[in-house]
Amino acid sequence: MPRVQFIDESELGPEERALIASAEQTGAPDPRVVRIMVRSAAGKAWVRCWNSVLYGGLLPHKLKEMCRIRISVAHRCGYCSTVRSHVARAEGLSEDLVHEVLNDLASPRLSARERAALEYADLFKAGDDPIDSDAVYERLRAHFSEEEIIELGMLCAQTVGVGRLVRSLNIISWEEACELNPALADQEH
């Protein structure tokens, strides 16, 4: 059971309904977390910001979703690890490719650009110091524009920070996530 309750239907206004409907349409963020976040003005602002970062911008949505899933599994968020964007699926992000993202960054199915983004996501998740390096940004510049680097960094920051909050809400436990998707149990994070 979540540690913060879902908003009751009777409390939903037009804005809250629209944010939940958007989540139902896109698949990420999952409507369950949105039903908690829309309880507050700050939560609603985050949902709007997240939708802008995840679905807007210059980077392909599929690439951003791959980074989001990799970070989510690394911090063992049952909720975030099982959520899948319908948009990314339509762009070719299959569960087979997710398996490659989680287990084999050397996979020929991943482009050099995708590997660079996923490696940056790993460094971002590891803490403050690993990304605070000229060498990291030089590697990123080989594949991304300055604008894309900012976008990728914002995605990773949102995924790491808000992901920790969402994990703590206990919408779905890691154990429940592993029951839904047994492949998660193989992750050694």
PLM features: residue spans?
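Short acidic alpha-helix initiation/capping motifs at coil-to-helix transition points
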Residues: A41-W46, R76-C80, A126-D134
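Membrane-interacting alpha-helical segments
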Residues: Q25, K64-M66, P108-L118, I172-L180
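Acidic/histidine-rich alpha-helical segments that form the ligand environment
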Residues: R113-M154
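N-terminal hydrophobic signal/anchor transmembrane helix of membrane proteins
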Residues: M66-S85, H99, I150-R167
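Mobile cap/lid helix-loop segments that border enzyme active or cofactor-binding sites
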Residues: M1-H61, S85, R89, L184-H189
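Helix-adjacent hinge/juxtasegments
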Residues: R76-S111
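Preference for long, well-ordered alpha-helical segments
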Residues: E146-Q187
